[in-house]
């Protein structure tokens, strides 16, 4: 079983990328569980046909400790198992704790079955606080992919996430598997992301082009592969799935200093000299 965490700044398209990637892996015959670790609880919406899944934390709040697995785990597209850890009530408590509670509960209830090929954790990545780092800190996820684009804030976040990975890689076995570019059609985007990934000692594992097909599929509450398996964008996600499945380059990243990051941004025209 490969346990994979997908990180990236809010709004970058982590959840969309994760759900489309897992659909691609399902097309390869893989058995998958997706654990949403974002308080927004939208990590499994497309796999479940738009159903807002009841989160682990909401279920615990309403039903107490005596929870059955089928009340928090739902099967979605292609039998992909879906869980949302959810978040605390606004203004109360720590969302990161919710992730810890959820993963512990899934373990107790026997969700990590032997037939699983992959478990994906879709994690909010703007804040690399202790709770959100939990899937890597506790050694749950062994490999991490960071979703980024050619925008400055996406790269700042990716660099910060790399610092978190570096910190926990020494104690646990977690490694960076690569950067996934979710294109924003920025000038020199491919070249910038490729240089950024290499600077970290990693790779740009796939460049996902921007496509109106993604929005169309989302409006229909489906992944692109379910909505139109023959379109070019579906093939992009299948290619991403193949690359992740075949990936063997797992590194402890070498995060950049602020100065070095800004140099790279200047080099590719994102920052003015």
UniProtKB/Swiss-Prot annotation:
Record protein name field: Nitrogenase iron protein 5
Entry binding sites for ATP: 8-15
Cofactor binding mode and count: Binds 1 [4Fe-4S] cluster per dimer.
InterPro entries: NifH/chlL_CS, NifH/frxC, Nitrogenase_Fe_NifH, P-loop_NTPase
PROSITE patterns, sorted: NIFH_FRXC_1, NIFH_FRXC_2, NIFH_FRXC_3
Transmembrane segments: none
Record GO terms (molecular function): 4 iron, 4 sulfur cluster binding; ATP binding; metal ion binding; nitrogenase activity
